[in-house]
């Protein structure tokens, strides 16, 4: 009988070194097919008044205007043969859905509201990571819905798809370039929200590559705090860079593959490869929340410890494991 010894698991240092080599290989030999799919045509959206102007009786008008933009994008997508996109957009245009903004171009931009924005004492802005666009919007909406349910009355959640996310497996997901491009839009949105709701506690809840976006954008913003979930990096070196007064929390589930990524930054002539500090490392300085044992996509899953932790934090009750 032949005996095959059980292979020993690779040492963490060797695994990280190998992953670093893969990152470098991704720079030199880009993955075929990793480029973002061709943009689906969509009309240019009409300008909208500032949220502070719309927040009262005008909010329903702003929601209706965004719905009209979505329906216009449906017609354009159908006319150009993009029927999958058209079907996804029809779901977004349901009368019960409420969008502050919509732009169907370049993968799509949207800001959807869950809860009563004018009366909410606490507002969570949910910032997604790689691979999210109008065709793959469902997980973002689901997470926002569950977080709003966990927070209860007196709260609102905004699902903010306000930037061109990188593809899930791509060189773009290994550099801060997409996060830097998103920075002006996220800052402008949060400032508009703050002007409309000066007394509300506003939190950024950022998943995966969204942690890099929030890390780059949060400094100088008037927010109560930032929550980084499953972040492959924080975009900055320490939690202090996210603002002198903001609470900074981070969590990583026990089954999240992001833990295997090396946290290195390599300056090359044409790109910076790496996403800065590990958000859950002691040196970063964030408070650590209970993220449970799920995987990378499970942070806001129904019944998850991370969902309960985020709800407690945003509600101002902290987290038991912090």
What are these regions (language model features)?
Residues 1-139, 316-322:
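Flexible, membrane-associating and regulatory peripheral segments of lipid-active enzymes
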Residues 186-188, 192, 208-209:
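Well-ordered beta-sheet/strand-loop patches within structured domains
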Residues 130-133, 138-145, 150-188, 196-200, ...:
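Lipolytic serine-hydrolase domain surface
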Residues 110-114, 191, 214-216, 236-239:
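Generic recognition of flexible, low-complexity loop/linker segments
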